[in-house]
Amino acid sequence: MADFRTVTYGAEFHRLLQRVAGHAPDAELAAARLALAEGRVGDVARAVGTITAAAGLAPTDEEFALLAAAEPESVTDLSDTRPGQWPMPAVDFQPTAPADAGLFAPEAPPPLLDLTAVPYEFVAAVTDETDQRAVEAMSRVPGARALWRAWRLSDPRDTPARVFVLAADVPGADLPVVAALLQAETGAAVEAYAPGDELPAYQVQARGAAALLWADEEAYGIGIARVFDGVDPVTGPWFAPGHPVLDGAERDRVGRYLEGGRPVLMTTQRMADVVEPARGAVVPMSYRTDGVWVWTDTVTYYLRTHGLAPDPELLAHVRGREFRAPVVDDVAEHRTLAALFRPAAAGPVGVR
């Protein structure tokens, strides 16, 4: 580890290794990441050239020039590829190992998990020593912000592969070293990025179907806003005659806050307007969040169209923030989605 160092164009080569992830054996990619952290840029260029040629991938003109400058022979076999030819690897990810599926019975395993807000017994059941070493390493990884773990599934005949996704608030040139540090600690694949980076689809998919193992911000409860005052098993949802109403400037300010939430689950489905059924199925149902509360566009519709106030606790929260919506980071978005899909096996802790 003492030999790790930053290099010129380290951020660009790190990005290239992110782009080829999933198109090469993990051991081959791990060797290339180690080479980059050790400053062996020529070896990295050769590895990327070999991977892209074998997979039929086409680097951009800028990437081609970067490879050629580092190692001219690395681009020898890339002349037959078409610009922009870069399909997504045929892989799937899930937050727990396939062998752990029985822990969630009779439910199906959830699409993602937040293990920072569940009982220790559940965490212990879905993690192992490698995960624990990764979490312990966070105190030694510069700028560590969050750590996810996913299991990658490709061919059903293959053994599931562990993939860590690490968010570290460091300059791009330092990401190869950060990734290599955690890779050395765990022996597993590590996809490192800095918050705000635009990630390739492979890493986005891995993080979006992962278990959040650790975050530098303590876990907190996620509020899930109610829409209606009640639901009749026969006639459906309803609002009470005395449901609070918002008017004037506050109605508009609350509406803008709700509309400005980060989309987390989008749908084109519409439901009927229960206040004016003659309007038909016009009520939107997508989910949004500010990182602390999650609500549906249904809430905003009834506010904008009929003046009906949101869930009292959500409204108090919006007022407490003086109607200024915060930026929702990747960890907050993950925690929100995990609260929506929280399995019974994980218990009720951490949700309002």
Go through each PLM region and give its residues:
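Long, compositionally biased intrinsically disordered terminal regions
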Residues: 10, 89-92, 104-107, 112-117, ...
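Alpha-helix N-cap/N′ positions at the starts of helices
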Residues: 12, 24-27, 293-294
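Repeat-mediated protein-protein interaction surfaces in helical alpha-solenoids
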Residues: 7-17, 28, 279-281
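Long, charge-patterned amphipathic interaction tracts in eukaryotic proteins
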Residues: 4, 54-154
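Amphipathic alpha-helical repeat scaffolds
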Residues: 2-5, 17-21, 29-37, 49-50
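Solenoid-repeat scaffolds in large eukaryotic assemblies
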Residues: 32, 41-45, 311
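Extended intrinsically disordered or low-complexity segments
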Residues: 136-140, 147-169, 174-178
